[in-house]
């Protein structure tokens, strides 16, 4: 079996993948050649938070501290599909140089940490972050039709595993006017199986089976479940009839429940003193939250 470091080296050599980004030392743009419209040096450029920020970094740390992609503005007609290449980051907590998800937007949030990915799912009123009422939504991922990703230059990080920042290279975020799900996968030999990008019309419940209940705010550990779209060793491809049912959700454990979530400063933000993916002894995320 490959170790993590050996696998990353092999992939980098074969596919030309660049080294992981450190969120404390981001360039202005990570994909300027691909036509990136936003920025990645967000704290330096925008400060703690800015309602006009065009930040394209996402942080998924806990049920209280996560971000989602949303349109930078609305014209009353554009859909998620129209704007997927230029989406910007909206976060529950300040300190990342992003826009804020307004209090009251999120109606339910269910955070799951597994050995292979972190995931946040739920419902809300995303007209508050410029998604049109009635928009059934679309998928954001790091590849897109051109290979530059949607949004172009989008980067995802977490500190849920070690307490220090770790880039999650494979991810998927489905956003509609009323529902969201975001799964971000750790680097490894099966990251594209846990975070596939070929089921863009199947939506949240099929791609990320989980709890979506309104009025519930929970944080759990858990198991991954099954690879989306793979049944008895065979891969189903979107559009082939019949359409199979979603895989069952993995098992949850160690759940903590909260009455609500709200804006406020993040407990920890990227700093030039931080070290990427250094394993340290740490208390659970919910014990750190105020």
Swiss-Prot record:
Disruption phenotype: Results in a thickened cell wall with altered chitin composition and leads to secretory defects. Decreases virulence on maize; double knockout of ROW1 exacerbates the effect.
Secretion signal span: 1-19
Record region (Disordered): 266-290
Main location: secreted
Keyword Signal: yes
Gene Ontology annotations of biological process type: appressorium formation
Top-level taxon in the UniProt lineage: Eukaryota
Keyword DNA repair in record: no
Compartments in which it is found: Secreted; Nucleus
One cellular component term from this protein's GO annotations in UniProt: nucleus
Keywords, sorted A to Z: Nucleus, Secreted, Signal, Virulence
Function: Plays a role in the formation of the appressorium, a specialized infection structure with the purpose of penetrating the host surface, and is required for proper remodeling of the appressorium wall and vesicle secretion.
Protein name, per record: Appressorium protein ROW2
Taxonomic path: Eukaryota, Fungi, Dikarya, Basidiomycota, Ustilaginomycotina
